[in-house]
């Protein structure tokens, strides 16, 4: 069973659902390509499927997770979701393993009023319940604190109408110690025995130390070879901490001198807005299909057959200072000229979310990604003219 919700269902996901006859619960009138070919179920059927206990369940979006607490408040998956989705509860559960890791929960009012001189800079501030990189800020020193919190408050005001409180809680925040190291994003499911099965392994790129955007993720033979085995072992530890069984997750981690520290875990879904489909282009793994068939990628064989290219996902977003509803048009053709080899270009509905395009692309090295990270996307966006009376 797959639960589909806004903001986005890709053609590939819809085709995978149709081909594999996966039952669907549709929420909030989300647009589903070729909807007539899929098996739609009622929301009430969710509890029936959960009680059966033998059917894999996946969400395509954070937005739909709140139906678990409504229709199955006492189910194991609801409990696990609540723990993993709440960053404070997540950190508390991990604290026996990461004993020296600083974190604290505060309200927005407390963020504005607290004395920052007592904080162990550099720190990260982010919503306790959040999505993507919205509201995530790195603060390196006391002098940066107040201006950053002002910006955070503004972001929360802008996004409060775009996401429900179950997706982004704009009143409760976590302050935590900065996690150093290279960042990876992993799509994985856990078998009935709690064994992790890695379906996707991506590396994240940043423009600079304070960049928290999701603009570039990439993968390659080197990325997989350098990290697969150690991440697999780490996921076994995570599985034991949270008793993860028969559950898919998207986990973000950092690796520094072979120490792996989780940043956050997104339960019951894979990388959002189509990011997980980079695996199809890079090494032929359709995460959704593998999960529902409970198949395991043969990573040794996959790596042996891969070329030496860099396979990347670019998430082109409208700046948080711009109201999406003020966007008139995007010059997609001009934007496309920034890519050497486009594998797939997906324009998005700009007035519904901050993402105006997602692009899967291929390059011989990381130079194209570095250039894309530094590209000013505002030049491709046309806004409504302001009329002053």
Where are these regions (language model features)?
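Conserved ATP-binding module of the ATP-grasp superfamily
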Residues: 100, 142-180, 241, 386-387
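Short, charged N-terminal beta->alpha structural module
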Residues: 1-36
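ATP-dependent carboxylate/phosphate-activation module, predominantly the ATP-grasp catalytic core
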Residues: 177-180, 187-243, 266-295
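Short acidic-glycine loop/turn motifs at beta-strand connectors
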Residues: 140, 190-196, 255-258
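Conserved metal-phosphate-binding beta-hairpin within the catalytic cores
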Residues: 239-274, 304-309, 315-323
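Peripheral (often C-terminal) accessory segments that flank ATP-dependent C-N-forming ligase machineries
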Residues: 292-389
